[in-house]
């Protein structure tokens, strides 16, 4: 499937998707028009301002009537301990619309209980969510050993394969993981093999804390900024809109005044 990532700058990305015959593919063949917020690398409990940045983001998203749901793509805590997950749960309860949550390496492999507590509190480390005919599929990630290379656990691979097998061939899919699908991910080829069995239109990732486009072996990929403010006065996140045949990414800097 031929796909083009048409534009990239600090504040906007645009994804144009075409079928093999040069005509718009199924993601653009319908009059879909919706938006979602995308947060990643929240790192709750890393800096004194991390909690405030997340709370401000939740309030900002709630105040935007155009946002239909929110995706959080991993490293939502710094050390993955129970108190961090409990605080995260309390903050995320503030969302007035659905949110989809994935763990990253900081959430599941940097503590003794991360692997079990994330699933216990948030019920699952993956999601499959349909919105206006588009399927959003996300699976958990983390190194197989503490401080090891990026890796998607075997149980998540098996789950991903089962979800893709059950997905209609023509249905557009957007895949989400904490790690970019590149050579740094130890089992990247296995993941890409699964993604290419269906109509995967784009892949979203975090981990690197920057807005950037990349080529995931022929599938358009986008890496998102961290919600942390760092040197800015306040944090931010990305707003993603599917409008016709274009998937648009806009950086949102939270306004507090």
Residue ranges of model-derived segments:
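Short, solvent-exposed aromatic-acidic interface loops
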Residues: 250-257
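N-terminal active-site segment of His-dependent metallophosphoesterases
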Residues: 19-86
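Active-site glycine-centered loops adjacent to acidic/histidine catalytic or metal-binding residues
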Residues: 41, 74-75, 104-105, 178, ...
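Bacterial Sec-dependent N-terminal signal peptides
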Residues: 1-24
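Extended active-site neighborhood of metal-dependent phosphoesterases/phosphodiesterases
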Residues: 82-161, 165-172, 190-202, 214-247
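Short, catalytically relevant binding-site loops at active-site mouths
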Residues: 144, 180-183, 210
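Acidic-and-aromatic substrate-binding clefts and catalytic sites of carbohydrate-active enzymes
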Residues: 45-51, 76-83, 108-112, 181-185, ...
């Amino acid at each position: 499937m031929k796909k083009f990532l048409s534009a990239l700058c600090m504040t906007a990305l645009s994804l144009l998707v075409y079928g093999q015959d040069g005509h718009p593919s199924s993601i653009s063949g319908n009059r879909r028009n919706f938006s979602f917020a995308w947060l990643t690398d929240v790192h709750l409990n890393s800096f004194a301002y991390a909690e405030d940045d997340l709370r401000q983001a939740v309030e900002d998203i709630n105040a935007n009537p155009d946002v239909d749901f929110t995706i959080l793509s991993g490293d939502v805590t710094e050390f993955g301990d129970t108190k961090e997950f409990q605080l995260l749960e309390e903050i995320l309860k503030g969302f007035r619309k659905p949110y989809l949550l994935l763990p990253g390496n900081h959430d599941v492999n940097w503590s003794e209980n991360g692997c079990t507590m994330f699933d216990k509190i948030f019920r699952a480390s993956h999601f499959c969510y349909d919105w206006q005919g588009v399927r959003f599929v996300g699976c958990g990630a983390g190194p197989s050993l503490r401080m090891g290379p990026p890796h998607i656990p075997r149980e998540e691979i098996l789950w991903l394969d089962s979800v893709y097998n059950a997905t209609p061939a023509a249905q557009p899919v957007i895949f989400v993981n904490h790690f970019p699908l590149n050579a740094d991910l130890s089992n990247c080829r296995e993941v890409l093999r699964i993604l290419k069995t269906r109509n995967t239109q784009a892949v979203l990732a975090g981990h690197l804390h920057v807005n950037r486009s990349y080529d995931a072996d022929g599938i358009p990929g986008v890496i998102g900024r961290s919600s942390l403010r760092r040197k800015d006065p306040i944090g931010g996140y990305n707003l993603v809109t599917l409008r016709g045949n274009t998937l648009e990414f806009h950086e949102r800097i939270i306004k507090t005044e």
